[in-house]
Amino acid sequence: DIRLRGWHLGALLVQVLGFVLFAGLAAITSDGAGRILLECTMICLICPCAAAAGVITRKLDGDLAATVSYLCLTNLAATFLIPMVIPMIRPASDLGFWAYVLRIALKVFPVLVLPGLLAWLIRYTTHKLQRRLMRFAPNSFYIWFIGLTLAMVLATHALFMNYPGGWALAGIVAVSVATCALQFFLGRRIGKGRVNSITAGQGLGQKNTGFLIWLGYNYLTPVTSVAGGLYAIWQNL
C-alpha cells in the first residue's frame, strides 16, 4: 500500500523550507562558528528518512507502508535539492556552478535513489527473489540494531577526526538535539490520529545519519559531520 498520505506534504515542507531557509542564512554568513551551526541545522533538516524508521514504526504499531512512501519522497527531494543548494554555499574552485551540481547529483543518486529503484525492480520482475528476501523480514529489527551500532561508530569517528573545540562542540550538540526533538515533535503534530502521529513522527525524525555524516564531511565544513554522528545518538534515545 505504497501511496501518498495526508501528512506527507506537511512533513516534507518542514524539511524543504527549513533547509532552504538555513541554507540561505549560511550563504550570507561569513566563515566561523555561526556558519558551522547554520550548516549543521540545514543538513539535519534535509537529511532523508532512515530506512530503519520502518522497523521502529512497525514496533510502535505505526503504518509501515506510509513510512516507506515518505522514505521515497524524502530521498527524491534530497536528490534534487542538495545538488542545487550546496554549490551556492560552498562553490567548487575548479568547477562552474552547473558542473558542480552535476557532480554532487551523481554522488547523491547512487546513495539515495538507486537502492529504491533496485527494490522496485526486484518486486515487480523477480518474484522468486522477492519471496526469498521477504523471509528475512522478521529479522529487520536485528538489522536495524547492527545499523545503529555502525552509526555510533561513525559518530565517534566523526567526533575524533573533526573535533571543533569545546564551545563549538557545545553549539553542535545543541543544534543536533534541537533539530532532532523539533522534527519528532512536528511530525507527531502533523500526523492526525494515533497511527499517523506515530508514523509521521518517525518519518520526520528518524534520519539516514550515515548519509548526513557523508554529506557534511565531503561538501560542507567537515566538522558539520559531527552533527550527523550526534543526531544518530539522539534519535535512538
Describe each region flagged by the PLM.
Residues 1-237:
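Alpha-helical transmembrane segments of multi-pass small-molecule/ion transporters
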